[in-house]
Every structure is written in structure tokens, then in C-alpha cells.
Amino acid sequence: MLALKLMQNRTRYQHQGSTPETLTKILQDDTNLAVWQRQLPLHISDFAQLLLSLNEPLAESLCLELPKEDAEPDLTGLASGFRDLEGYEGFVADLKWLVSAFACLLGAKRIGLRLRVLDKAMCPRFHVDHVPVRLITTYAGVGSQWLKEGTMDRQQLGQANAEPQAQIQQLNSGDVALLKGEKWHGNEGFGLIHRSPQPATGERRLILTLDWLG
């Protein structure tokens, strides 16, 4: 019985589903990835594609304070250079919903938000995050890549020749993923192994990340 318990404690699972309730799986001790496989509303995906088509830079960060459970995140001025594009208000409304859902699920009072347009892999080698949990969603472009538990020797993280190319999993555009990191209590040594994808030449991606800061 003790051996079985020890084996269970050293196993991590990844869950994917078509409803937002799937994200609650991240709270389970034996889970280090939960993915809501969502289909983006057309007005949001159209906005994201239009934004990318302008070939303008975007790299914005916010530290959001949410002192009360029902506090609405203040995203005033976020991506304001694109406010005249059709679909901007719906896009910001979606960002607010994700921030609120993230805060509600984790009981977070402070959240770090990053919204970026990328034309290259920000973190091209497989790695783990030294945070409790991170939300990642790609609004347009290729999604982040990850590995199932046991696919790669963690001692070889960062070494390109050790990466199992045939076993790489990939998120789709629109998917909302919660990635458990090394600083989640009890998850030390089991942060999800993942990396940024390399966009094709001339392609870009619009990505949102949320970090639980407190």
C-alpha cells in the first residue's frame, strides 16, 4: 500500500476538455496541466487576426490588484493602440472574463498579466516555470507545446538533442491552459514541461499569460 501511494505521488496527469470546468482539474494534486479546448468566438478571432495583420508591436504588462472576490479587473488602456479596430471591446471583455475566472479559481488577489505579439519563440527550449501556476492562451497563431509526464528526462531540460520531437503535444489557438509550476506547494519537481513554438517565417502569434502573484 505504501509503495502504491508513493507511486501515485510521483505521477502527474494532464486533462483536456471542451468546457471551462476542465480548468478546475488543476487543483488536483496529481495534475500539472488543465486545458479548456475552446472555440474562440468569431468576433474575437477576427480581431486577433486583424491585429496581427497590422504588423505592429505589442508587449504590455499589468499587475492587477483584486482585493475582493467580486472585484472587476481594471484593464483600462490595455492595447489601447488597437482600440479603433472592430472587435476590440469584445476582446477586452474576454480578457476580463479570463482574469476573473483565474482569480476566482485560485483565490488570487494579485495577478500578473502579459499581452504580447511574438514573431519568434520566446522560450524555445523545453523548461518548467518557477511559479505556482500560469494561464496561457494564444488568440491567433500557433499554440504552446508541452510534454506528457515521463516523456523527457528532467535532468536534460534545456538540451536540444534530448527533446523527444515525435512526442510533442501542442495547444490549439483559442485553448485556455493552466500550467502548474515548481512553486505550487507539493508540485516541486513536477512542473509541466513546455516551450514556446517557433512561428513559421512571416507568421506571428498573439498570446496572453496570467501569473498568480498572491
Mark where each language-model region is.
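Extracellular-facing segments of soluble proteins and assemblies that are Gly/Ser/Thr-biased and enriched
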Residues: 76-120, 128
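Active-site environment of non-heme Fe oxygenases that use a 2-His-1-carboxylate facial triad
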Residues: 95, 115-117, 139-149, 211-214
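Short, surface-exposed beta-edge/turn micro-motifs
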Residues: 30-33, 132-135, 174, 204-205
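Short helix/loop capping segments that flank catalytic or ligand/cofactor-binding pockets
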Residues: 44-46, 146-148, 180, 187-188
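Catalytic core of Fe(II)/2-oxoglutarate
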Residues: 164-214
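Catalytic core of non-heme Fe(II) oxygenases with the double-stranded beta-helix
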Residues: 120-175
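N-terminal auxiliary "cap/dimerization" subdomain that precedes the catalytic jelly-roll/cupin core
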Residues: 1-79, 89-97
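Glycine-rich, charged/polar anion/phosphate-binding loops
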Residues: 20, 121-124, 192-195
